[in-house]
UniProtKB/Swiss-Prot annotation:
GO terms for molecular function: IMP cyclohydrolase activity; phosphoribosylaminoimidazolecarboxamide formyltransferase activity. Belongs to the PurH family. Its EC number is 2.1.2.3, 3.5.4.10. Keywords: Hydrolase, Multifunctional enzyme, Purine biosynthesis, Transferase. Pathway: Purine metabolism; IMP biosynthesis via de novo pathway; 5-formamido-1-(5-phospho-D-ribosyl)imidazole-4-carboxamide from 5-amino-1-(5-phospho-D-ribosyl)imidazole-4-carboxamide (10-formyl THF route): step 1/1; Purine metabolism; IMP biosynthesis via de novo pathway; IMP from 5-formamido-1-(5-phospho-D-ribosyl)imidazole-4-carboxamide: step 1/1. This is Bifunctional purine biosynthesis protein PurH. Residues 1-145 form the MGS-like domain. The IMP cyclohydrolase activity resides in the N-terminal region. The gene is purH. The keyword Transferase applies. CDD domains: IMPCH.
Length: 521
C-alpha cells in the first residue's frame, strides 16, 4: 500500500493535479526545492526532504536526496524482517511511491550558447540514483518517470486501496532503466564528442562512444524473408515528418518490407513542393510525378511503369481526395501514404480493408544519422540531404538547355537521388519516363531505363536524363541520346569528363554538371 510518496521533477507537467489526487487518497508528500514550493503554493501539505532527513540541502543543491533516510526507505524489502527491523531501528519510514524526472540535459546541450559548464550542471545525480533504487525494488515501490503514467497509477490505486500491482510496477521499473540508460547515453555521446578544446561549438558530429536509443513499436510477422524474424523500433528523437510517426487508419499489419519501402516513398515525395506522387517497388521509384493535384500526379506516376506499380507502395504529399482514391483503388496496392485522407477517400478504401492507409504529417525533419550495419560494426554518416540549387549548376556543352529542359533536368536529378545506384532516370513534363536502377554498369542502367519507357509506350524524344554519378565512358551517354534524350544532368568528376562532354557536343545535346554525387546502396 502506498502511504508516502517522494516527488521531485524537472518537467512539472500535471504534477500538481497528480499530487493533489495522492493527497486526497491520504498519501504523505515529500518533495525537494522547486517542486516542493510549487506543491506548497498550490495549498498541498508537503514536507521538504531537508526537513524530513534533518540534513539541509548543500553544495548549491547538488546534495539533496543522497541520504540513508531517503534510500533506506526506498530500497528496503518489505518481505525481509531484517530490512524492516533496520528501518525501525533508525527511524526510517518506507517511501512507497517515487515520482522523479531528470534535469533537462538533452534540451540544455541543444542550445547554441550551451557551455561545457552548463552541460555539467545539468547532469542529474540524485534523480537517477533514486530512480534506480526504486526500480530495483519495484516489487515494493512504484516508480514514475513519465507524466503520461500518472493517470495509470492513480486509476490502479483508486481501484485497489492505494495499491499498485506488480505487473504495473514491473513495467514502470523497466521504463526507468530504459530512461536512465538513455540519459547516461546522451551524456556520454556529448562528452565524448568534445574535442581537445572542450568547446560546445567545436564538438565532433561523431562521438568517440555512440549510444543509440530506440523503443520497440511492434514485432513484425517476419523480416525481409519469411525465415527471418524482425521488429520495428522508433528513434526516441524521431523528427517531425518522419515515417516512424505514422498513424495507420486501416489495413493489415505492416511488414518489414512495407516499412522499408514506405520510408523510401515518403522521403522522396516530401521533397517536392508541387502536388506529387511516388510509387515504390523494392525501395526503388518506379514512377514519380508532379501534377495539378493528387489524382493528376498519380495518373502520371502510374503511367511510367504500370507493370512494376502492381503491389507497390504509393506516397502523396497532398491530401488523398476521392478522385485520387478512385484512381488508386483500380490497382493492387500494398500501402498508401499521405498527410491526410478525405472522408470520401476513406470510404473508397473501406471496401478494401487489406490496403494499409498511413497518415504522416509533413515535416522537413531528418534523422541525425544514416546508419548501416556491417559485420561487427556500424557505418555512420550524415544524410544525403543536399539539394543542388540552379545557381550551382554548370553548363559544360556548347548548347545551353532551354528553360523547359532545365525544369526537367532538376526534376530528374531530384528523383535520381532516391534510385539505387547505378541510376539513370529519363524524365519529361514533370514525370519519370524510364528508370534504370541498381545495375553494376551505368550503360546497362541506361539501356534498362530506355527499355522500360518502350514497354510503357512512352516516347523519350526530347527527354531529360539524370545520372546519379559521373559517366565513366561515353557509352552510357550514347545510349540515352539514341533513345531520344536532348539534355543530361550528372555530377561530373570522371577522368574522362572531357571525352563525355565532347560526345555531348557531338550529339548536339546540353549537359549540366552538379558537382554532387548521389550514390545509393
Amino acid at each position: 500500500m502506498i502511504k508516502q510518496a517522494l516527488i521531485s521533477v524537472s518537467d512539472k507537467t500535471g504534477i500538481v493535479d497528480f499530487a493533489k489526487s495522492l493527497s486526497d487518497l491520504g498519501v504523505k508528500l515529500l518533495s525537494t526545492g522547486g517542486t516542493a514550493k510549487l506543491l506548497a503554493d498550490a495549498g498541498l501539505p508537503v514536507t521538504e526532504v531537508a526537513d524530513y532527513t534533518g540534513f539541509p540541502e548543500m553544495l548549491d543543491g547538488r546534495v539533496k536526496t543522497l541520504h540513508p533516510k531517503v534510500h533506506g526507505g526506498i530500497l528496503a524489502r518489505r518481505d525481509l524482517p531484517e530490512h524492516m527491523q533496520a528501518l525501525e531501528q533508525h527511524g526510517i519510514p518506507t517511501i512507497d511511491l517515487l515520482v522523479v524526472n531528470l534535469y533537462p540535459f538533452v534540451a540544455t546541450i541543444a542550445k547554441d550558447d550551451c557551455t561545457l559548464a552548463d552541460a555539467i550542471e545539468n547532469i542529474d545525480i540524485g534523480g537517477p540514483t533514486m530512480l534506480r533504487s526504486a526500480a530495483k525494488n519495484h516489487r515494493d515501490v512504484t516508480v514514475v518517470v513519465d507524466p503520461a503514467d500518472y493517470a495509470v497509477v492513480l486509476d490502479e490505486m483508486k481501484a485497489n486501496g492505494n495499491t499498485v500491482g506488480y505487473p504495473t510496477n514491473f513495467r514502470l521499473a523497466t521504463k526507468v532503466f530504459a530512461h536512465t540508460a538513455q540519459y547516461d547515453g546522451a551524456i556520454t555521446n556529448y562528452l565524448t564528442s568534445l574535442t581537445d578544446e572542450l568547446k560546445h561549438a567545436s564538438r565532433s558530429t561523431y562521438p568517440a562512444t555512440l549510444n543509440l536509443a530506440f523503443d520497440k513499436v511492434q514485432d513484425l510477422r517476419y523480416g525481409e524473408n519469411p525465415h527471418q524474424s524482425a521488429a520495428f523500433y522508433r528513434d526516441l528523437a524521431t523528427p517531425a515528418g518522419a515515417l516512424a510517426n505514422y498513424r495507420q487508419l486501416q489495413g493489415k499489419e505492416l511488414s518489414y518490407n512495407n516499412i522499408a519501402d514506405s520510408d523510401a516513398a515518403w522521403e522522396c515525395v516530401k521533397t517536392f513542393d508541387a502536388p506529387a506522387c511516388v510509387i515504390i517497388k523494392h525501395a526503388n521509384p518506379c514512377g514519380v510525378a508532379v501534377g495539378n493535384d493528387s489524382a493528376d500526379a498519380y495518373a502520371k506516376a502510374f503511367q511510367t511503369d504500370p507493370t512494376s506499380a502492381f503491389g507497390g507502395i504509393i506516397a502523396f504529399n497532398r491530401e488523398v481526395d476521392e478522385a485520387a482514391a478512385q484512381a488508386v483503388a483500380k490497382q493492387f496496392v500494398e500501402v498508401l501514404i499521405a498527410p491526410s485522407f478525405s472522408d470520401a477517400a476513406k470510404q473508397v478504401f473501406a471496401a478494401k480493408q487489406n490496403v494499409r492507409l498511413l497518415e504522416i504529417a509533413l515535416g522537413d525533419g531528418h534523422n541525425a544519422f544514416d546508419l548501416k550495419r556491417v559485420g561487427g560494426g556500424l557505418l555512420v554518416q550524415s544524410l544525403d540531404s543536399r539539394n543542388v540549387q540552379p545557381s550551382e549548376l554548370r553548363v559544360v556543352t556548347k548548347r545551353q538547355p532551354t528553360a523547359k529542359e532545365m525544369d526537367d533536368l532538376l526534376f530528374a536529378w531530384r528523383v535520381a537521388k532516391y534510385v539505387k545506384s547505378n541510376a539513370i532516370v529519363f524524365c519529361g513534363n514533370g514525370m519519370t519516363l524510364g528508370v534504370g536502377a541498381g545495375q553494376m554498369s551505368r550503360v546497362d542502367s541506361a539501356r534498362i531505363a530506355s527499355i522500360k519507357a518502350q514497354n510503357a509506350g512512352l516516347t523519350l524524344a526530347g527527354s531529360a536524363v539524370a545520372s546519379d554519378a559521373f559517366f565513366p565512358f561515353r557509352d552510357g551517354l550514347d545510349v540515352v541520346v539514341a533513345a531520344g534524350a536532348t539534355c543530361v544532368i550528372q555530377p561530373g568528376g570522371s577522368m574522362r569528363d572531357d571525352e563525355v562532354i565532347a560526345a555531348a557536343d557531338e550529339h548536339g545535346i546540353a549537359m549540366v554538371l552538379t558537382g554532387v554525387r548521389h550514390f545509393r546502396h
